[in-house]
Amino acid sequence: SAVEELDYVFLTHGDEDHINGMAELLEDQELGVRIRNLVLPPEEYLDEKLAGIGRTAARNGTRVVTIEAGQSLRNGDTDLEITCLGPECGTGMGPGNGASLVLGARYGAFGMLLTGDVELEGEQNLVNSGRLGRYPVLKAAHHGSRNSGTEEFLQIVKPAVAVISAGIENRYGHPHEETLERLKNAGCVICSTQECGAVMLRSDGSSLQIESFLE
C-alpha cells in the first residue's frame, strides 16, 4: 500500500545528494506524502541549504526539530528508538560531511547504524565517544569511500549486513575496493545499490528481510 504519512524525516547534512527533492516534498504535502516532523543536525552544523529547508518545512506545517549526540526519539506506537550518536556539539567543526548526523535505530533485536557521510575523523570521534555499539546492519558511511569503515570501527559495530548507496560508474569510484575488502573481512553481507538497485529492509523486531529492486 502507498505511504501517505511519514512520522520523521532526518536530513544528515546539506549535500545535494542527501537533500534533493526535499523542498518539493514539503511544499506538495497536500497532494503527496504528509511529513509530520523534520529532524536536522544541531544549529551550529546547519548550512544555508538545511536552514532553508527548515524554513520551508515550518511554512508548510511540518514540525522542525534539531537533535544532538545523546538525544533519542521514540515512536510511541512501537518500540522503535532512534538515538543520535553524533556529531558532538561544540567541536568547532562547522557544516559538512564530518558533521553528518549519525543515528542508531533499534527495534527489538533489530539495530541499524546510519552514518551519513562521516569518514575517518567522524568514525574515530564515534569510537572515542563511547556511544558506539553493536548494530547488525550498517549503512556504510560516505557511499563506501576509501576512508570509511575502518577496522577499529567495524570491530565495535560488528555488522552482519552492510548497505552501500552508490551510483553505477560514479565519478568518485565509490565504493572503494579497500573498503569492500574490510567489510568482507568483517563477515558482512554487502548490499550495494550498484548491484542490487533499490534496497528495502523490513523487520518485526526479531527477524530481518532484505528486498531489492532493479530495473
Residue ranges and their predicted role:
Residues 1-215:
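Non-globular, low-confidence helical/coil segments that flank catalytic cores
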